[in-house]
């Protein structure tokens, strides 16, 4: 299985003043823990880190223990463009790919393998967790318009897995139609292509704030 890891987090909400994936968690960078988790999955054979050229030296230094197992890919000015660059940098033999957020350093190898195996029967899969809070849809003035049934609501995570040809086609159509999305599964939705949900777990958080970092430290003790 081939894995692409977008790693261009600005760190603005972390108030880090640099790429948030370079922030330390228990003595190692966030990207270190992410790469370690991904490479622990038995079905993973190739990993590409997609980042900005100005971060390349520091990011690669922080994962030097895995330098012979990863490939660097220059990213674009958005996540969407970066993933497209990643797709175009995959080996020609790659048929399936997992896209995983660099800031989700607590994903377990079992979940990565599960996503990979589900791609045997599906063109697209994503990890997600059931929403437990009541969600409100509001208008632009802040007034509630609707309360959707939470039984049908899932919070998307990564990895998100795809057949390479299908995902590349989706990105090409997005460029043609000037679509902008926040995750790759959304492109499939816009094209009315099916995406299968795989239930994830609550520890697979995306670290975007100082509070997330504190929570991650607690999870890491049992990781």
Curated annotation (Swiss-Prot):
User: To which pathway does this protein belong?
Assistant: Isoprenoid biosynthesis; isopentenyl diphosphate biosynthesis via DXP pathway; isopentenyl diphosphate from 1-deoxy-D-xylulose 5-phosphate: step 2/6
- For this UniProt record, give its keywords in alphabetical order, as a comma-separated list: Isoprene biosynthesis, Nucleotidyltransferase, Transferase
GO MF, one example: 2-C-methyl-D-erythritol 4-phosphate cytidylyltransferase activity
Under the heading Gene3D superfamilies, the entry gives:
Spore Coat Polysaccharide Biosynthesis Protein SpsA, Chain A (3.90.550.10)
Q: Which GO terms describe its biological process?
A: isopentenyl diphosphate biosynthetic process, methylerythritol 4-phosphate pathway
Q: Where is this site: Positions MEP for the nucleophilic attack?
A: 150, 206
- Enumerate the InterPro entries for this protein: IspD, IspD/TarI, IspD/TarI_cytidylyltransf_bact, ISPD_synthase_CS, Nucleotide-diphossugar_trans
Q: Which PROSITE patterns match?
A: ISPD
Q: Where is this site: Transition state stabilizer?
A: 13, 20
Free-text function comment from the UniProt entry:
Catalyzes the formation of 4-diphosphocytidyl-2-C-methyl-D-erythritol from CTP and 2-C-methyl-D-erythritol 4-phosphate (MEP).
In the record, the note on similarity to other proteins reads: Belongs to the IspD/TarI cytidylyltransferase family. IspD subfamily.
Name under which the protein is recorded: 2-C-methyl-D-erythritol 4-phosphate cytidylyltransferase
Q: Give the organism, scientific name.
A: Prochlorococcus marinus subsp. pastoris (strain CCMP1986 / NIES-2087 / MED4)
Record gene name? ispD
